């Protein structure tokens, strides 16, 4: 709307941001109307470059370590001033957005970026409110200057780029980072620290809502199927990645989606396909001579992405929120082929598997993990984004599940009939069949079979899913090899779980040898 003399573009429209990005050579238009950009040598998040300022409010509240690295307050002040002065000497872009769709829990954010495209990205992913900050809350500031190069010896950073959260000053500093996912996840981490103080569980999950108002949550790491499975043409999307669960409400922290694009097809993912149009941003997607995206081309990265506002999704929850969840689904991509396509969990098992967060890094979003696919345990299905000790989030989850009576399921979107390289991955229609059965209530009170070693209960029948797939041992040609693989996986679970101090009932809910 306004443009000052010193080329500060404040709250200009998405169309103007696209225009500015192209004028400045930041990207190009694809045939489908989206803005296509490249993020340079960083095509994923850089966990080693992320810090939290250590000060009285964070000192004893954060699980410090490799994920949450402390940063000195004085160094932060010096670096913020340096980056801000650098940015003030060039054209830049400012937008005012909200993070958190529920009125009680939103954060007002002044987002300043050096590039037009990253501002557009923020406008896609965060919430553009009808009225900015109606409750007059204290404002957060995000300063994202991609062309600033940090000097580790001077600035105290790990490399030429950094992401630093300062809770005392309500500031997020992002410097030297072209991969825009850093901005989205930084504000997610902020809410993940703040929401538990309000008795709200922050979650790395997708959420959708049925015609009858029933809500389903999909927890999972990148690449396990959150975005794909929640984008269901028969249901209304609340969001694909970040939510809060408070008394009586599940709300989106964001106002957009950040979908993986590798091998995207109109047939398997029609909702996402249609959402990629003018106003959307494609990161590291290769175009052909006609400017048509080639989603199968992974020459830049496996982690190619599309950012688009929820307005691009036809069937969506108008207010970005819904009631409490009837079904809570933990998505795991099991490389070993040991886990069943669906297991029904009790409360103790829910706590165990939430804390474990077992899955695979598939086309990982983290730098340097491009080549192989490997198994991992990521607490709360999103360890990089949860600053407090894991127990805080697990206790809140169990409290919410018990209070509302949500049913919890573990769904394997990974391998069956053998491990990675031997078996085959469950196809999307099979997993959609499992999800549909869960959402219809068909598995509530279903007859189950207990699987020893991995200590899970599987339904004996799931409408629309081949019965021989339900017990994974049946899908292996070599049953002895399955038993060995199950023992190997159980050992990994037990070893990983040693770090948690929890009740014996929760410990006993996991795999047993």
Curated annotation (Swiss-Prot):
GO terms for molecular function: ATP binding; metal ion binding; phosphoenolpyruvate carboxykinase (ATP) activity. Substrate binds at residues 45, 179, 185, 305. InterPro entries: PEP_carboxykinase_ATP, PEP_carboxykinase_C, PEP_carboxykinase_N, PEPCK_ATP_CS. Pathway: Carbohydrate biosynthesis; gluconeogenesis. Binds 1 Mn(2+) ion per subunit. ATP binds at residues 185, 204, 220-228, 269, 305, 431. Mn(2+) binds at residues 185, 204, 241. Keywords: ATP-binding, Cytoplasm, Decarboxylase, Gluconeogenesis, Lyase, Manganese, Metal-binding, Nucleotide-binding. It is an enzyme of class 4 (lyase). Its cofactor is Mn(2+). PROSITE patterns: PEPCK_ATP. The keyword Manganese applies. One of its GO terms (cellular component) is cytosol. Its EC number is 4.1.1.49. Pfam families: PEPCK_ATP. It is found in: Cytoplasm. One of its GO terms (biological process) is gluconeogenesis. NCBIfam families: pckA (TIGR00224), PRK09344.1-2 (NF006820), PRK09344.1-3 (NF006821), PRK09344.1-5 (NF006823). Involved in the gluconeogenesis. Catalyzes the conversion of oxaloacetate (OAA) to phosphoenolpyruvate (PEP) through direct phosphoryl transfer between the nucleoside triphosphate and OAA. Belongs to the phosphoenolpyruvate carboxykinase (ATP) family. HAMAP family: PEPCK_ATP. PANTHER family: PHOSPHOENOLPYRUVATE CARBOXYKINASE (ATP), PHOSPHOENOLPYRUVATE CARBOXYKINASE ATP. Monomer. This is Phosphoenolpyruvate carboxykinase (ATP). The lineage of its organism: Bacteria, Pseudomonadati, Pseudomonadota, Gammaproteobacteria, Pseudomonadales.
